Amino acid sequence: MAGNRPFNKQQTDNRERDPQVAGLKVPPHSIEAEQSVLGGLMLDNERWDDVAERVVADDFYTRPHRHIFTEMARLQESGSPIDLITLAESLERQGQLDSVGGFAYLAELSKNTPSAANISAYADIVRERAVVREMISVANEIAEAGFDPQGRTSEDLLDLAESRVFKIAESRANKDEGPKNIADVLDATVARIEQLFQQPHDGVTGVNTGYDDLNKKTAGLQPSDLIIVAARPSMGKTTFAMNLVENAAMLQDKPVLIFSLEMPSEQIMMRSLASLSRVDQTKIRTGQLDDEDWARISGTMGILLEKRNIYIDDSSGLTPTEVRSRARRIAREHGGIGLIMIDYLQLMRVPALSDNRTLEIAEISRSLKALAKELNVPVVALSQLNRSLEQRADKRPVNSDLRESGSIEQDADLIMFIYRDEVYHENSDLKGIAEIIIGKQRNGPIGTVRLTFNGQWSRFDNYAGPQYDDE
């Protein structure tokens, strides 16, 4: 407490002397911090915004304090000053003055808080205790559900636990958010420009895609970007995304993280061996390999084992919370991540929103964008396309073809579609050619890039054919 003497000292002493009361587990809280916040607001109304960014009424432990803070918010909203007299009058009109301790308690709050200088720190304490209490409440709820499952399976109980914890994590205020002075923004911007100027990068300022023409369009996959790769079945979206991962892993030392919700890790590894070794993936899958194939694969394995920077998580039905926590762990252990790839977005789930698919997808895409910003890493998420494009004469995808497209299109920084004409036209003149259609790029041009598709190797390569109009 900021004052010279604590509030309710007699009550505290009685509790300490009573062994039965002392043995009770009291939820974590700080009466002194709460009183200092309330008293500080009465002393300096200008600190309201600092406090309101950190706490809400429910963060206060005692009911009287919740009522007082709520009434302060009402006064602030109406443009009225917050002081001993106005607050007492307002509480009196609401019939709550006696329930909060009367005029005497409000006067004590004001008197025993000498200044509002440290009110932000006190508000942080109040919020911290509130989060811990909420965690305890959720833990008790989960325990009760375990003792009395009411027909729910262990999977259902895990979903319940995850969703409750997820809500707590999402509700926490991020102190790094909010307005920044232009001086701070300029400093960071100039530092980034100087870094780019001093480092030779051939125009690639992000993660190198491994594809020259794509790098020219995008300058690489940028940190903090959510990148959507979408295509109809058989176009090679998993292959393309894996090639991006492989190229990133080979061209840098930072770890790359794959969340494969559809395909087991062994199949992912077989595809990578085929791609990097340029050995027919059918021969790898069936084990029909000759000496040259084995030599190529052994060489690739040696490189992969030397770098050891590819991580694969093939857990199914992952939630945004699980993806975030696992990515954080890898980033913490290795000092960062080079690239995250998720195959595919629609297989993720949010148990609390499972009844509304549109809201669920919106939460997933929002969470992936937040993850990209938090870890300052490009996140590549694969997405399905609506079947409706099959009815068009020109089956090249557009942004509106994204399944549950609204939120995905809004959150994405870069959207790339894969189109191979030979999938629809057997005698196409474009056999072996893939079009990477950039449908959206927040900080760059849209257009089309051609790549060569080598399906037998599960690989896209740089296109070396004649020039074409990509617009």
From Swiss-Prot:
It is an enzyme of class 5 (isomerase). Residues 1-26 are annotated as: Disordered. GO terms for molecular function: ATP binding; ATP hydrolysis activity; DNA binding; DNA helicase activity. The keyword ATP-binding applies. Keywords: ATP-binding, DNA replication, DNA-binding, Helicase, Hydrolase, Isomerase, Nucleotide-binding, Primosome. This is Replicative DNA helicase DnaB. GO terms for cellular component: cytosol; primosome complex. Homohexamer. The gene is dnaB. ATP binds at residues 231-238. InterPro entries: AAA+_ATPase, DNA_heli_DnaB-like_N_sf, DNA_helicase_DnaB, DNA_helicase_DnaB-like_C, DNA_helicase_DnaB-like_N, DNA_helicase_N/primase_C, P-loop_NTPase. Transmembrane segments: none annotated. Pfam families: DnaB, DnaB_C. SMART domains: AAA. PROSITE patterns: SF4_HELICASE. GO terms for biological process: DNA replication, synthesis of primer. Residues 200-467 form the SF4 helicase domain. It comes from Escherichia coli O6:H1 (strain CFT073 / ATCC 700928 / UPEC).
